[in-house]
């Protein structure tokens, strides 16, 4: 079974005076939120010790992370951390924990369940 992926336009708000609109890939198979290196001004990111392997099992080069940015859609914003990655095909990838923030669900041995009330 292949992970689900889809695209949507969001606003990435790094600070009150630095934000941009971008088409992101939302990927149920991704383990981290990623932004293409070069999209974020250097004064906003910091050194990272994160490690990440791509879908084709190659080590991705991660030197920096961004911890205080928000992703916004229809004026609803979520603060989520990102790693900055060189040579990505997509400018921004949002991961499974981001999807879980929107709609909490649990993957268990016997299937996927959700509790919309808590």
Residue positions per predicted region:
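Aspartic protease
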Residues: 3, 8, 16-118
């Amino acid at each position: 079974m292949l992970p689900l992926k889809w695209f949507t336009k969001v606003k990435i708000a790094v600070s009150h005076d630095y934000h941009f609109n971008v088409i992101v890939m939302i990927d149920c198979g991704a383990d981290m939120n990623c932004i293409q290196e070069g999209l974020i001004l250097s004064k906003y990111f910091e050194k990272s010790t994160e490690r990440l392997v791509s879908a084709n099992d190659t080590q991705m080069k991660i030197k920096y992370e961004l911890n205080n940015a928000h992703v916004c859609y229809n004026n609803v914003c979520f603060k989520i951390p990102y790693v900055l990655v060189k040579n990505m095909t997509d400018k921004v990838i949002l991961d499974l924990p981001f999807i879980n923030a929107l709609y909490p669900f649990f993957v268990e041995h016997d299937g996927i369940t959700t509790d919309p009330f808590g």
